[in-house]
């Protein structure tokens, strides 16, 4: 009797694979970026073994391709992620997210007094990195937050 210890996640024929997501961040990305708002199959692997990270999350979305803007927005929470475009079971394009200047309509401002929480406006944050930390500044209340504070909303 053979015993195979390798984890196997089914390959997709066509679509997007987001790999090297920090462990415990995959579900948050699915929610924030509305990656489940499709009628296509979405596969998520949580706490998978990773030589580089110890453990990682992985998301596969069949027949859906992310825009460059969407890929770059992932950099706020998964800066070392790779986004692979798959066609006929082969990687045809590999993208690495880079920090965008702005992120709109995705996040919620943590400031409970911000008008973006009570008025029908789309959230909007400017993004910058300082000393290895990602900071987000709300367009409306002009308060600046560490990305963890915004992620918890």
UniProtKB/Swiss-Prot annotation:
Keywords: Metal-binding, Pyrimidine biosynthesis, Zinc. One of its GO terms (cellular component) is aspartate carbamoyltransferase complex. The keyword Calcium does not apply. Pfam families: PyrI, PyrI_C. SUPFAM superfamilies: Aspartate carbamoyltransferase, Regulatory-chain, C-terminal domain (SSF57825), Aspartate carbamoyltransferase, Regulatory-chain, N-terminal domain (SSF54893). Its cofactor is Zn(2+). Zn(2+) binds at residues 109, 114, 138, 141. GO terms for biological process: 'de novo' pyrimidine nucleobase biosynthetic process; pyrimidine nucleotide biosynthetic process. The keyword Metal-binding applies. GO terms for molecular function: metal ion binding. Binds 1 zinc ion per subunit. It comes from the Bacteria. Involved in allosteric regulation of aspartate carbamoyltransferase. HAMAP family: Asp_carb_tr_reg (MF_00002). Contains catalytic and regulatory chains. PANTHER family: ASPARTATE CARBAMOYLTRANSFERASE REGULATORY CHAIN (PTHR35805:SF1). Belongs to the PyrI family. This is Aspartate carbamoyltransferase regulatory chain. It comes from Edwardsiella ictaluri (strain 93-146). The gene is pyrI.
């Amino acid at each position: 009797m053979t015993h195979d210890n390798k984890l196997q996640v089914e390959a997709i024929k066509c679509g997007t694979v987001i790999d090297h997501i920090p462990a415990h961040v995959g579900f948050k990305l699915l929610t924030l970026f509305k990656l489940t708002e499709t009628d296509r199959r979405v596969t998520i692997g949580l706490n998978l073994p990773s030589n580089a990270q110890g453990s990682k999350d992985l998301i596969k979305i069949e027949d859906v391709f992310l825009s460059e803007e969407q890929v770059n927005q992932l950099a706020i929470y998964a800066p070392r992620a790779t986004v692979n475009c798959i066609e006929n079971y082969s990687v045809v394009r590999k993208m690495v997210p880079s920090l965008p200047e702005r992120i709109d309509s995705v996040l919620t401002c943590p400031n409970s007094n911000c008008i973006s929480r009570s008025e029908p406006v789309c959230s909007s944050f400017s993004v910058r990195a300082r000393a290895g930390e990602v900071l987000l500044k709300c367009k409306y209340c002009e308060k600046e937050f560490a990305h963890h504070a915004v992620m918890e909303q």
